[in-house]
Amino acid sequence: MTRRMNFRSKKAARQRGDAMKRIGRILLCILMITVLFGISIVGNFVVKSENKSKEKKRTAIAKEEMKEWAAPDEETLKYYDLGEFSTTLPVIYMNTKGQQILKENVICGNIALLDGNEEAQSVSAVPNSIYRATIKYRGASSYSKFDKKQYRIKFYKNSKENEKKVSLAGMGANSEWVLNGPYLDKTLIRNKLVYDLARELNGWAPDTRFVELFVDGKYQGVYLAVEPVTNGESRLRLAEFGLLSGETAYVVNRDRIDTGTEEIETWGKTKGYTYNALYIRYPSKNKITEKQKEYIKNDISEFEQVLYGENFKDKRTGYQEYIDMDNWVDYFIINEFAMNYDAGNLSTYVYKELGGKLQLAAWDFNNGFDNYQWFHTETDRLYTVENSWFDRLWQDENFREHVCERYVQLRKTTLSDEHIADKIASYQEKLGDAVDRNFKVWGYSFDENLLAGTDKDGMSRNIGSYEEAMKQLTDTIRERLAYLDKELGGN
């Protein structure tokens, strides 16, 4: 009996001991979790503090970087009667390091940035940041005929192999950018206006910012910093992987023959239904495979065969299976609003997500609203309906109905008279004195006969002043919308 009781007491003691061990392990785990959590909090605090300190350090470039900054040239500023002026716009300082800028090949230089903060800053103030960059000219007629050049720039870290994502003028960080210099467009705002309106519609459109540019210390006037149609986190956000079959997300653009690489000959081109050339822009020429090239060519060819086939109107088996209808309708409307004669034939960007449908990205409206160099564009006719792909789409009453219904909606919002007027007024306020500075450099362009032909009244289309340019733009927009109200709005 006594032996049995001793056994039970020992067993109970062991159980109590095991329980205490379990409790001890639990307490130890809790303690470890608490310590780790504390370390995490402290670590995050340290990282954030370090980041903040880094941000504070980058409010101005370091002393050792000053020699890389091509500061404003005092003699040039005096020559244009500008002096050491201040601006509320972001300022870009391009340093070519004495090299000639080319269109065919990039040069390596650096670019310094003075961030705009809504308050006037001297353009001689120390920039906020400076980066290595490649620089080249871009454009077709703007490159060959106009003194004010367009630029394509790309930021890098320490070498040309390591791209650097930069938030240019407050836009989403990316390494590739376009600097559009309005020359033919004396209002300086055509591209900005249409891009901003397009960003309110279905599909992707570029973000933009007004900036002032210096190249090797010489003032170049007002430019528009523009997101090019590329893939990336702040851009199209297409899949960066492909399938073994060759299927891939892609970007192509239609433009003049011999203006790009990686051209594809699709069914529409070989059969004479489409014009100019299609170039693959994504995946890049350094990464694309032959299977992917073949897939992109066949994918667009299949769409074209259906579009120009007998049963193209069929809602299940016709062209609607291949395109994002809402996006294509909005693209059609914004280009007709801008009187963009080129839409579908030139500067036309098409993109497709892996497993998705074809979409279009708005691009290049410098010639919009009767600003073509070679001829007068009338406000009372449609243009896109005559161009590649859209000539066939317009034959489908369902597409036309979608366009008309959407146009009526947009006239109450994005394309309302009030909204457009507010946009234009905000741009003029934003630019302020920068307009005068721009034309102190490029004012002689008012004396050039850049626009051929005459307007509807038989008068020269050439603009004599900034005020005249603004009046021409607003008058053209008013007349254009009045026509579209009748043609698309049912009035």
Predicted ranges, named:
Residues 183-203:
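A conserved alpha-helical element in kinase catalytic cores
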Residues 122-124, 146, 164-166, 190-191, ...:
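Short, solvent-exposed loop/turn and secondary-structure capping segments
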Residues 151-154, 175-181, 188, 212, ...:
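Structural recognition of the beta-strand scaffold that forms the well-ordered cores
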